[in-house]
Design a protein with these regions (language model features):
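Short acidic loop-to-helix transition motifs that present clustered carboxylates
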Residues: 40-44
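A conserved structural/catalytic subdomain of Rossmann-like adenosyl-cofactor enzymes
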Residues: 45-273
Length: 273
């Protein structure tokens, strides 16, 4: 079962068509608006979503938009948004989309949500929601993407991968900032870039300057910060200077300077004579 969350319907027909073309047995595919009615399609029949859960959820919601939040009594008691005990801030609905996706995720499913990076480290209600997600072992991976990747924004976004049946109590952090090629004013993920990211995600192990597997306990001790840069060390690309070699070069310069001074003194003394 595949679920796509998108306000506009431009992506959904393409997704549905792709499954018609590649699969003789069509899975359940759904398109849902976070504020609108929810429907799913199986073959060519439309029915209203009830308690249907989905194996794959992909979402690229708008970043940090406003929503009613706890001003709306219905939302406060809505099981999609309230399990953490708080709702996403009214000025930043990012976690509302994430909690919405989690509510439709099957037990053995995977959800991938493109996120604004601020939700990974900001405090307040967002920190409490991160705590809920981490303490319940729902966060599987955080992937830092390159900047200028999406049309209309230069922000370096992230992907949050959620699972309800993880095999460990850790989160994989992947720094994929370098996994892109420059195309005019934007960056683009090539097939090779995508393969590299997927392989790192699948291998689920530490790679210097690329990925780090961190326990939920350590993340909790770090104020539930999910920023990739907190855990994946940046490679130091500055030129490394050998101090011993530098000191020898300085000594040689001083010696040559001393010799030159003596030669200059000699020349001056000869002129005076």
């Amino acid at each position: 079962s595949v679920l796509s969350f998108k306000k506009a319907d431009s992506t959904f027909p393409k997704l549905a068509l792709s499954f018609f073309l590649i699969s003789t047995s069509l899975p359940t595919i759904a398109n849902s608006s976070i504020m609108g009615r929810k429907y799913f399609v199986k073959s060519n029949l439309f029915d209203k979503l009830d308690n249907k859960k989905f194996d794959i959820i992909v979402s690229n919601p708008p970043y940090s938009i406003k929503w009613a939040g706890d001003d709306n009594a219905v939302l406060i008691n809505d099981p999609r948004y309230s399990p953490a005990g708080v709702l996403a801030p009214k000025s930043k609905a990012d976690f509302a989309f994430i909690m919405h996706s989690l509510s439709w995720l099957a037990t053995n499913g995977t959800a991938s949500i493109v996120c604004f990076p601020g939700i990974l480290y900001r405090g307040g209600a967002e920190q409490k929601i991160r705590k809920y997600l981490i303490d319940n072992n729902f966060v599987d991976c955080i992937i830092q993407l390159p900047d200028n990747l999406f049309f209309g924004t230069s922000i370096a976004t992230c992907i949050m991968v959620l699972k309800k049946s993880k095999k460990d109590n850790s989160i994989l952090f992947i720094d994929a900032i370098k996994e892109c090629v420059k195309v005019t004013n934007n960056n683009k993920l090539t097939d090779e870039n995508i393969e590299n990211i997927v392989k790192t995600f699948t291998d689920r192990k530490d790679i210097d300057y690329v990925s780090k597997l961190v326990s939920n306990k350590e993340i909790g001790e770090n104020d539930y910060n999910l920023s990739v840069s907190t855990y994946v060390e940046k490679e130091d690309t500055r030129e490394k200077i050998d101090i011993d070699v530098l000191n020898k070069e300085i000594d040689e310069i001083v010696k040559r300077e001393s010799v030159l001074r003596e030669e200059i003194k000699k020349i001056i003394s000869e002129i005076e004579v």
